[in-house]
Amino acid sequence: MKKALQVAMFSLFTVIGFNAQANEHHHETMSEAQPQVISATGVVKGIDLESKKITIHHDPIAAVNWPEMTMRFTITPQTKMSEIKTGDKVAFNFVQQGNLSLLQDIKVSQ
């Protein structure tokens, strides 16, 4: 009987101890990593609003280890394109999402 009581008490305190430890573990809200916003400069070579693409010959972009080249960027709903035209020198920001370069902001530069 004494042995059974010892086993029962040990089991009870073990369960209480584990519950106390579990309650001390705080689950922090994990925020999703925000994509890196990359800044660049270049010259607009073409705009296709129907397919939501803009072609820019950009300077080297160190943040993504890209050399100077001409490439297409996807125009997003937040991109204000009203003052941009082919031939403009521009400063722009984009995020890389897989194979897509999503244009976030673009402005005519001097």
Swiss-Prot record:
Gene3D superfamilies in UniProt: Copper binding periplasmic protein CusF
Compartments where found: Periplasm
Known outcome of mutating D48N: No change in copper resistance
Extra remark: The cus system plays an important role in copper tolerance under anaerobic growth and, under extreme copper stress, in aerobic growth.
Quaternary structure note: The cus efflux system is composed of CusA, CusB, CusC and CusF. Interacts with copper-exporting P-type ATPase CopA; when this protein is precharged with copper it binds very little CopA.
NCBIfam families registered for this protein in UniProt: PRK09838.1
Protein name, per record: Cation efflux system protein CusF
Protein's organism: Escherichia coli (strain K12)
Encoding gene, per UniProt annotation: cusF
